[in-house]
Amino acid sequence: MATRNLTMVVDRKHYEDFTERMMDITPYSMTEYSKVNMYLHHDGYPEWQGIQLANWLQANPFQDSSRVAAKLVHDHYYDSCYLYNNPNQIDHQYTYIVFVGDGETLILCYNQYSNREVFCYTPQEVLNKYMEDMDYTNFAAGKTRSDEQISPYTSDKPKHITIDKNNPFNTD
């Protein structure tokens, strides 16, 4: 069974504002501030997606939330990746909220099924706590999730096939 997850990118000023006013920070409370709601169908648990996000954020230390959102989608895209207007439109177990801007970047992980925050750490703290011996994407070397995906398609264009009249079963 897939551990579905969704990643939101929010400007850090909203984290600071909610913290200062002692308001709960949940995916629901951050919905209107999110630059992207990226759903991934597989491996949403902290030991995988938490580490993937932490590694990616260390390799892409941008502060502008719009730029982070765009690059995140580009680098994490694979066949089971979808974008939604609202994080509540799709059933998923974990929501990751990436807070970027002035100050340290933070990753908040929220378990939708238990309605609880799992953690709110810097990328390095996520790596320290959840890193395991897995084959993570090497974002620091310029790799992306789509680079690692095995796909029967090499482009969106139909493949041109030449049929040999003498041997119609040979499509070389």
Summary of predicted features, one role per range:
Residues 19-48, 113-114:
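Short, solvent-exposed aromatic-acidic interface loops
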